[in-house]
């Protein structure tokens, strides 16, 4: 059980009588508790308090008119704890005892009535607590299952979409591969065609060179024929001029065979042309082989680069697909987290509202308990004073030797209420009563701080003021 700290505050007031005697001593005790104090039968205390208010406040009205004048007042044993009357008793001691007996009977009847009402209120409060139904949060389990099914379907659909996107990307990659191969073959074809065109140009140049050489040979042949013809003409002219007059014998070298020389020159030129043709053909073949080797190596390098590019593209596409899948998963998880946070925040708000309501109810119940505890202590104090008064009445009933004077006061004298702690002072008929003194109130407040059944501190404050 939690430690309770209660600070009781006791107020004690005394009221002086109108004839110079104490008309009664009022002691009002109240408790100011810090925390929660628990008293037995709180519901009964509440009923007892409410009934005590209605019952005790009307004790003054239950007295007969013959005993009290119109100026008689009662405090209901709550304010001052006693009663005083400005009228006078009209009767003997027997009538006074009868009045006190009637008052005691009324008080006992009121006590029984309060006990019955207390029991009734306790039963009603118990029934009310039994019929209270606690707040139950709604069950969302069925909705959670439906949401999980939809989430599974969404994940399956997302995986199917990712698979279709992967297939589409693979088809695009295959199309890119075929396009790249086509472009490679087209570039190779263009290179070969360019080489063929270059070789054709070289062949045309060689053909032109051959035609030039043939033209030069033909011109040389024609020049040789012209020279031969001119030589023969000159020889014939000289022969005609000399005739038979001169017989010249020339011992000269044998004549040169021009046909043989031309044939030799032709053979030399043909050999030279053949050598040039062979050299050009060898150079062309060498250049072609080198170019083919360069083309092959370049094509191999290009093929390797294209293969690497294709692999990198596939890797990039796969990574992009995985990134999209991760983004979609992250978005779904974020949405799920947001929904979960919203749901739990709403539930938390409901729980907080419920907790606030319960705390408000607890604070109200605590305030009611404190108020009922204070009223209960007040009623206990009233009960103690009433028991003392009953004991006083019993003492008055048993001791008949103390009697009132036979004749009332000649002047308007106020009656004296007998209290065990203060002896009664009757009025003297031959001496007029002095004027009534002022009535004063002395309030003594004792504040004690109690924790775990031990008194920690105690303070006393006395305040006097006239009425």
UniProtKB/Swiss-Prot annotation:
InterPro entries assigned to the protein according to its UniProt record, in alphabetical order: IF_conserved, IF_rod_dom, Keratin_I
Entry keyword Cytoplasm: no
Record region (Head): 1-93
Region (Coil 2): 257-400
Site annotation Stutter: residues: 342
Stretches for region Coil 1A: 94-128
One CC-aspect GO term: cytosol
Residue stretches making up the IF rod domain: 93-404
MF GO annotations: structural constituent of skin epidermis
Region Tail, residue ranges: 401-467
Tissue: Expressed in the hair follicles.
Keyword Iron: no
Gene Ontology biological process: epithelial cell differentiation; intermediate filament organization; regulation of keratinocyte differentiation
Stretches for region Linker 1: 129-139
Keyword annotations from UniProtKB, A to Z: Coiled coil, Intermediate filament, Keratin
Coiled-coil stretches: none
Region (Coil 1B), start-end ranges: 140-240
Residues annotated as signal peptide: none
Stretches the record annotates as Linker 12: 241-256
Domain of life the protein comes from: Eukaryota
Protein family membership: Belongs to the intermediate filament family.
Misc remark: There are two types of hair/microfibrillar keratin, I (acidic) and II (neutral to basic).
SUBUNIT field: Heterotetramer of two type I and two type II keratins.
Name of the protein described by the UniProt record: Keratin, type I cuticular Ha6
Source organism of the structure: Homo sapiens
Gene: KRT36
